[in-house]
From Swiss-Prot:
GO terms for biological process: coenzyme A biosynthetic process. This is Pantothenate kinase. It comes from the Bacteria. It catalyses: (R)-pantothenate + ATP = (R)-4'-phosphopantothenate + ADP + H(+).
């Protein structure tokens, strides 16, 4: 174990799955398929072995958060205010963050049927393409400087204080922020925040996004495996884009397969891999839990902060 993981307890899949006794997955195969991202691979057994114990662990943290909030209120002689439980999920492009986020949202909704469970992605806090072009940053999209961190931190602050908050909406089909469209959040019980940058402290030194998190997860994998998944996903996106001339990726959809693969590999090497190695992976040890994936997308190791 490297020094980076010295403060984590390594748990094998076999050991982890014994931490939950229920054999029921809480969702159907059809529901699981509907929330699984392109070229991701997850089974009902993965839900039972990995995610049901994870739901148990999140409940442990939520109870601890509520107890601490109660004790603080007594100490300060103030009325008790239950705040939203915020979960941050980070990891590389194409590693499976979206699948994990949607699955957790569904499972938390099933295990807490009277609770409001919401999901937001930090893609919505990217600057619009026009602004990135004007600043000469379009080729740096996804890097720290391409996010409106002040807006994102203000959003999280509003959520944490029980206020109604609004998030911009990003479309991968148009590769841009959707003008005049907002996603509203009205004091949810749980909020899942998913994005490559959720543990970073970009342009603002006041605080980290993770200061607002009650629990946090990093999805990890060998970069060579993620490269393969990224290229496979890119090819799948091109197939879909052929049917929609307005899709951003339609301009690449007619490329011969070999050229499309070469293009995707170049983007991976010069954009996504650089971003991963310089800005995303170095934040890994800020997570409470690291889920490591093997080449077949299966989670084989779990690291829990001590």
């Amino acid at each position: 174990m490297s020094n980076e993981f010295i403060n984590f307890e390594k748990i094998s899949r076999e050991s982890w799955k014994t931490l939950h006794q229920k054999a029921k997955a809480l969702l159907t195969q059809e529901e699981l398929k509907s929330i699984t991202s392109l070229n991701d691979n997850i089974s009902i057994n993965d839900v039972i072995d990995i995610y049901l114990p994870l739901i148990n662990l999140i409940q442990v943290y939520k109870i601890a958060q509520e107890n601490l909030s109660f004790s603080k209120s007594l100490f300060l002689k103030k009325d008790i205010q239950l705040r939203p439980f915020i979960i941050g999920i980070s990891g590389s492009v194409a590693v499976g963050k979206s699948t994990t986020s949607r699955l957790l949202q569904l499972l938390l909704s099933r295990t807490h049927p009277n609770s409001q469970v919401e999901l937001v992605t930090t893609d919505g806090f990217l600057y619009p393409n026009q602004f990135l072009i004007e600043q000469g940053l379009l080729n740096r999209k996804g890097f720290p400087e391409s996010y409106n961190m002040e807006l994102l931190l203000d959003f999280l602050d509003s959520i944490k204080n029980g206020q109604t908050a609004f998030a911009p909406v990003y479309s991968h089909d148009i590769y841009d922020i959707i003008p005049n469209q907002k996603q509203s959040f009205n004091n949810p019980d749980f909020l899942i925040v998913e994005g490559i940058n959720v543990f970073q402290n970009q342009q603002n030194n006041r605080l980290y996004m993770s200061d607002y998190f009650d629990f946090s997860i990093y999805i990890d994998a060998d970069s060579s495996h993620i490269e393969t998944w990224y290229i496979e996903r890119f090819l799948s996106i091109l197939k879909l884009a052929k049917r929609d001339p307005h899709n951003y990726y339609a301009q690449y959809a007619q490329l011969p397969r070999s050229e499309a693969i070469a293009f995707a590999r170049n983007v991976w090497k010069n954009v996504n891999l650089e971003n991963l190695e310089k800005f995303i992976e170095p934040t890994r040890n800020r997570a409470e839990l690291i889920l490591h994936k093997s080449a077949d997308h299966k989670i084989d190791e779990i690291y829990l902060k001590k």
